[in-house]
Amino acid sequence: MCTHTGHSAAPSLSGLIDAEPCHFWLPLMPNEPTDVLPPTSFNVPFGTRPGIAALGERFFTRLSPTPLPSPYLVSVAPAAAALLGWNETDLQDAVKDPAFIDSFVGNAVPDWADPLATVYSGHQFGVWAGQLGDGRAIRLAEAQTPGGPWEIQLKGGGLTPYSRMADGRAVLRSSIREYLCSEAMYALGVPTTRALSIIGSDAPVRRETIETSAVVTRLAPSFIRFGHFEHFAAREDHASLRQLADFVIDNFYPACRNAANPYQALLRDVSLLTADMVAHWQAVGFCHGVMNTDNMSILGLTIDYGPFGFLDAFDANHICNHSDQQGRYAYSQQPQVAFWNLHCLAQALLPLWRDANAADPEAEKAAAVEAAREALDPFRDRYAEAFFRHYRAKLGLRSEQEQDETLMTNLFRVLHENRVDYTSFWRNLSRVSSLDNSHDAAVRDLFLDRAAWDAWAAEYRARLQSEQSDDAARTTAMLATNPKYVLRNHMAETAIRAARDKDFSEVDRLMAVLSKPFDEQPEAESYAKLPPDWASGLEVSCSS
């Protein structure tokens, strides 16, 4: 969800904890189903389990998706389908069955499905926004597979009781971007939700202009967000809040159950996974664009691909979201924003270890706040450890040395000053020699100030020589760490323009290339080139 409602500085934990409870939610809608869709018998290679439906109807509304006229398959992702048990041969047979399209666009409800929309709230651009969703995402079912549970969700599946003033739809443009980036991020090794398919329709929807509709089928072990906890905390519904936390602990963080304070342990573990995720974003040059608390996964997964972007020319303060005029979610701000969002989660969870009958309420409150601080304290160290681990690997360094932070700081400075293409830099750096500048040309040519490269390269070579780096082994390791292919905005735009004319070949071509981002792929060399001049004029925003 992406709504620009303002901007605020990150408060301290005590500031959040001490704030008055928020009461700006919309009332829950009556839990009544929409018109019942025709059932369909569509065989799938997985069983199902209740998942979040076991919590009861305070957490969701059962409903049917809203059908789309004349749906058509845009693309299906074999790697994501494999999570549900389809091999490539069976998948090709499955997509030929009209029931596949009907099931995953929302035109019929399979006999194994239990569609519902969950309720959550959250902070958007630093401001409490009240109840937010699910406004257009409908959980179709929760698959039970040998690899664990996979929640199957239709994004763009139609109106829900939580749609507010929106239409419940997603457009083809944004659906292609989310579909491709979900699978690209997985291939890069970044924790992420997955994407099974896109199904389109010529049904018109109004955004800045009239566009056509699409539904992305998304997969994740769970789509529970920070905002789910914020919703019940804001309503002071502590029983439901505890029930939700227990569900998450029992299903995803079972080790927390053995802690003296399981809910504090949950907060700590979520913060650690969030730190890992954001450090990985920084390393691959990914900018999320709209890190609202309702877009933060309780499992530390990248979720809700909207106005995202990968860095082209390196700018530490890059803003990928045209709607983010003040740069709250700029590339350099992502770690701090993640920490701010964790403070919001801490505030939501705090009632779970408060004692309403304490003899000394002030002392009890201080102790509860301190427990929250203790849970969040490891975030900074965990983020720093993950950050330096990723960048040492990107630099081909096998050991930790005291000067590494200075080496990296100097590198980021010259990359920023020269607006060096981020992905191309790291890929070409993988092949430089530790002994001389004989293999420097490809990376040196990326710099406007060649002397700046020469100075930093001398520093880098000295560092490599200090650990007697073997160039061949180092190059192999760096090429497996520094991708050749990422989903640049102009690549997605090219696929979108073709798809508007019902040519989906570029979507499938990109999916194939991005599924092997570290491989050379000579036939895909054009996707590794610097962005064309027209790409600088592309803007992405919250419109989806």
UniProtKB/Swiss-Prot annotation:
For the ligand (Mg(2+)), the binding residues are 295, 304
Q: Which domain of life is it from?
A: Bacteria
**EC number in record:** 2.7.7.-, 2.7.7.108
Q: Which UniProt keywords apply?
A: ATP-binding, Magnesium, Manganese, Metal-binding, Nucleotide-binding, Nucleotidyltransferase, Transferase
InterPro entries for the chain? SelO
Q: Give the top-level enzyme category.
A: transferase
Q: Which residues are ATP-binding? A: 133, 135-136, 155, 167-168, 218, 225, 304
What positions constitute the catalytic site? 294 (proton acceptor)
Q: What is catalyzed by this enzyme?
A: L-seryl-[protein] + ATP = 3-O-(5'-adenylyl)-L-seryl-[protein] + diphosphate; L-threonyl-[protein] + ATP = 3-O-(5'-adenylyl)-L-threonyl-[protein] + diphosphate; L-tyrosyl-[protein] + ATP = O-(5'-adenylyl)-L-tyrosyl-[protein] + diphosphate; L-histidyl-[protein] + UTP = N(tele)-(5'-uridylyl)-L-histidyl-[protein] + diphosphate
Q: Which cofactor does it need?
A: Mg(2+); Mn(2+)
Family to which the UniProt record says this protein belongs: Belongs to the SELO family.
**PANTHER family (alphabetical):** PROTEIN ADENYLYLTRANSFERASE SELO, MITOCHONDRIAL (PTHR32057:SF14)
What is this protein for, i.e. what is its function?
A: Nucleotidyltransferase involved in the post-translational modification of proteins. It can catalyze the addition of adenosine monophosphate (AMP) or uridine monophosphate (UMP) to a protein, resulting in modifications known as AMPylation and UMPylation.
| Protein name as it appears in the record | Protein nucleotidyltransferase YdiU
Organism the protein comes from: Cupriavidus metallidurans (strain ATCC 43123 / DSM 2839 / NBRC 102507 / CH34) (Ralstonia metallidurans)
Give the organism's phylogenetic lineage: Bacteria, Pseudomonadati, Pseudomonadota, Betaproteobacteria, Burkholderiales
